[in-house]
Swiss-Prot record:
Entries under Pfam families matching the protein: Flu_PB1
Gene Ontology, cellular component aspect: host cell cytoplasm; host cell nucleus
Biased composition annotated in UniProt, kind: Polar residues: 55-64
Protein name: RNA-directed RNA polymerase catalytic subunit
Similarity section: Belongs to the influenza viruses polymerase PB1 family.
Classification via InterPro entries: RNA-dir_pol_NSvirus (IPR007099), RNA_pol_PB1_influenza (IPR001407)
Chain segments carrying region Promoter-binding site: 249-256
Location(s) in or outside the cell: Host nucleus; Host cytoplasm
Superkingdom of the source species: Viruses
Domain RdRp catalytic span(s) in chain numbering: 286-483
Region Disordered, annotated ranges: 50-82
């Protein structure tokens, strides 16, 4: 049957159909190959926008640096990074005037956080540039490596476990004449295989010590590694994102804590809240503007877009903001917050892996590492790449490019939001001193501007004034990509507002479907996604029911677990049929064991095992929930797990789902091919780290685990905990005298070994 697609929309208001135009079905585009070209683009673009600034040379690293601050006044229509310090400071002063005590209070809150934060805060986050190995690593490993190197170089303040003490070590490390680091390397040798008598290559992994002089160390400490941003929809070109090393991370964290605390107190800030809370906040601002634009006033809204937000932000500007925000605060606090922007003013961008070359004629492939780009003959490159390399050459040092202006993606989201809001704040009538006034919303680089005025000329004048004010602080509103509408219809951070927020359901499409973790988690995540969308995204009952049926179908095809009485033949059907036939209560079988689906839209909140428990045969219950089942490597499962779901916009977000441990909650084993590479030593470190953490958690169940205060080590803490627990168990008669004595003996032995070490 042919359906005329326009018929589908006859009854649908236009604003609800907007979501069908989004590029969210199907797989998002991923990048392949190296990000070197994209990174060079970013570096060159950033310098181009600030080209009229002053050039200086960093005395420590010899890196050329461009400073556009207080440069020429910006020109119309051309994006530029020439922020004027006095304008930024004045915007901050007015923001404080409108919100008395906001900076003071946020500083006090942040000071408390600074004194309490532990080093392990830095283990959160995924890939981090590891300066000791000069490549990316999981955050926990990169931190462990950094601390290990610090300690072997006599920097031990970090042993207190407080982040601020670790940062003291970072500061001291920058004054050292040289640092000794441990790097991994691999040796290859050809040996004859005894069995096959063929020659094979044998690899051994070694660790070697290496000395790094002050200049090289500073370059590494200030380096941001770059990667290509993956899975970005609706774009033709990829772009580069940065991951900073451990030296920068802690300082950035404190700055962002302060900025977050300020954003929470600003009604125009779209951060740090999200979801429904964000919608409510936005709706308030709109309501305020619409109520105030009485019959005499016009109200228009700009759905705003800024040109190259990151490339035109400037760390020196952020330093000025922090200096203002923390005035009258203790010296140590001001110092610790000013370090992040100073490090960013001296940052280096690592160019990634370099370029791949292949010759079709000679069937050769070779990689030109980034370090060689400074000296290689350019005749091998095509025109556009040649131009890029020529431009970037003066900035290159050891395969990294000096990048003083600009911010790189996602580093100071909160602080840049404060800057944006400070301009929105200037729209009050008492500041514009005329008939027009404005307000709006800001969330990192995204903004919506609402302008009220008695007539169209006033609206135009208001928009112009806003545009020019932004220019003075390095924000470039794009005239091409922003559009204006009567207030009541606009888009902000992919929320569509039309007299209230319209559910943009297509954004959630990528998170429907089977996640591929394991049978148990996938079922749970699948129904939770449907449930959440019924709550938050106008997913109606009929559509939800259909989504559920499609999900179950998808699930059965993924895990080849069609119902036991089906005709479909798969690899598993023989076993599942046998199970079906010998089960008395067939309704009790899980879907993944060929059972029927008992979910409907009323019971999505109940885990499948609980839903069917009463219906299960007793022996099936025994097999399903048996921790001694030899086929399952069990992790202890909390009642709630976190899944990573991919919404169409923004980062992957974490979603809670109920987890019931069954024989279906298996964990896939690690791919073995890593064991033959130079990463192997790293993997072993990581596993060691994991084992220690798991052991520690066994001693301190989460309910009783208070963060350790004072300088007790993990081992001491576990030993003392074991003694206390043993005494309680002995006195209450849970363990015998002999067992108690044995535990005490083991504890003493451990302490003795530590003393000998």
């Amino acid at each position: 049957m042919d359906v005329n697609p326009t018929l589908l929309f006859l009854k649908v208001p236009a604003q609800n159909a907007i979501s069908t135009t989004f590029p969210y079905t199907g797989d998002p585009p991923y990048s392949h190959g190296t990000g070197t070209g994209y990174t060079m683009d970013t570096v060159n673009r950033t310098h181009q926008y600030s080209e009229k600034g002053k050039w200086t040379t960093n005395t420590e690293t010899g890196a050329p640096q461009l400073n556009p601050i207080d440069g020429p006044l910006p020109e119309d229509n051309e994006p530029s990074g020439y922020a004027q310090t006095d304008c930024v400071l004045e915007a901050m002063a007015f923001l404080e005037e409108s919100h008395p005590g906001i900076f003071e209070n946020s500083c006090l809150e942040t000071m408390e956080v600074v004194q309490q934060t532990r080093v392990d805060r830095l283990t959160q986050g995924r890939q981090t540039y590891d300066w000791t190995l000069n490549r990316n690593q999981p955050a926990a490993t990169a931190l462990a490596n950094t601390i290990e190197v610090f300690r072997s170089n006599g920097l031990t303040a970090n042993e207190s476990g407080r982040l601020i003490d670790f940062l003291k070590d970072v500061m001291e490390s920058m004054d050292k004449e040289e640092m000794e680091i441990t790097t991994h390397f691999q040796r290859k040798r050809r040996v004859r295989d005894n069995m096959t008598k063929k020659m094979v290559t044998q690899r051994t992994i070694g660790k070697k010590k290496q000395r790094v002089n002050k200049r090289s160390y500073l370059i590494r400490a200030l380096t941001l590694n770059t990667m290509t941003k993956d899975a970005e929809r609706g774009k033709l070109k990829r772009r580069a994102i940065a991951t900073p090393g451990m030296q920068i991370r802690g300082f950035v964290y404190f700055v962002e804590t302060l900025a977050r605390s300020i954003c929470e107190k600003l009604e125009q800030s779209g951060l740090p809240v999200g979801g429904n809370e964000k919608k409510a906040k936005l709706a308030n601002v709109v309501r305020k503007m619409m109520t105030n634009s009485q019959d005499t006033e016009l109200s228009f809204t700009i759905t705003g877009d800024n040109t190259k937000w990151n490339e035109n932000q400037n760390p020196r500007m952020f330093l000025a903001m922090i200096t203002y925000i923390t005035k009258n605060q203790p010296e140590w606090f001001r110092n610790i917050l000013s370090i992040a922007p100073i490090m960013f003013s001296n940052k280096m961008a690592r160019l990634g892996k370099g370029y791949m070359f292949e010759s079709k004629r000679m069937k050769l492939r070779t990689q030109i590492p980034a370090e060689m780009l400074a000296s290689i003959d350019l005749k091998y490159f095509n025109e556009s790449t040649r131009k890029k390399i020529e431009k970037i050459r003066p900035l290159l040092i050891d395969g990294t490019a000096s990048l003083s202006p600009g911010m790189m993606m996602g580093m100071f989201n909160m602080l840049s939001t404060v800057l944006g809001v400070s301009i929105l704040n200037l729209g009050q009538k008492k500041y514009t001193k005329t008939t027009y006034w404005w307000d709006g919303l800001q969330s990192s680089d995204d903004f919506a501007l609402i302008v009220n005025a008695p007539n169209h000329e006033g609206i135009q004048a208001g928009v112009d004034r806003f545009y020019r004010t932004c220019k003075l602080v390095g924000i470039n509103m794009s005239k091409k990509k922003s559009y204006i509408n009567r207030t009541g219809t606009f888009e902000f951070t992919s929320f569509f507002y039309r007299y209230g927020f319209v559910a943009n359901f297509s954004m959630e499409l990528p998170s429907f479907g089977v996640s591929g973790i394991n049978e148990s988690a996938d079922m749970s995540i699948g129904v939770t996604v449907i449930k959440n969308n019924m709550i938050n995204n106008d997913l109606g009952p009929a559509t939800a029911q259909m989504a559920l049926q499609l999900f179950i179908k998808d699930y059965r095809y993924t895990y080849r677990c069609h119902r036991g009485d089906t005709q479909i033949q798969t690899r598993r059907s023989f076993e599942l049929k046998k199970l079906w036939e010998q089960t008395r209560s067939k309704a009790g079988l899980l879907v993944s064991d060929g059972g029927p689906n008992l979910y409907n839209i009323r019971n999505l909140h109940i885990p499948e095992v609980c839903l069917k428990w009463e219906l299960m045969d007793e022996d099936y219950q025994g097999r399903l929930c048996n921790p001694l089942n030899p086929f399952v490597s069990h992790k202890e499962i909390e009642s709630v797990n976190n899944a990573v779901v991919m919404p169409a916009h923004g980062p992957a977000k974490s979603m809670e789902y109920d987890a019931v441990a069954t024989t279906h909650s298996w964990i896939p084993k690690r791919n073995r091919s890593i064991l033959n590479t130079s990463q192997r030593g790293i993997l072993e470190d990581e596993q060691m780290y994991q084992k220690c953490c798991n052991l520690f958690e066994k001693f301190f169940p989460s309910s009783s685990y208070r963060r350790p205060v004072g300088i007790s080590s993990m081992v001491e803490a576990m030993v003392s905990r074991a003694r206390i627990d043993a005494r309680i168990d002995f006195e209450s008669g849970r363990i015998k005298k002999e067992e108690f004595a044995e535990i005490m003996k083991i504890c003493s032995t451990i302490e003795e070994l530590r003393r000998q070490k």
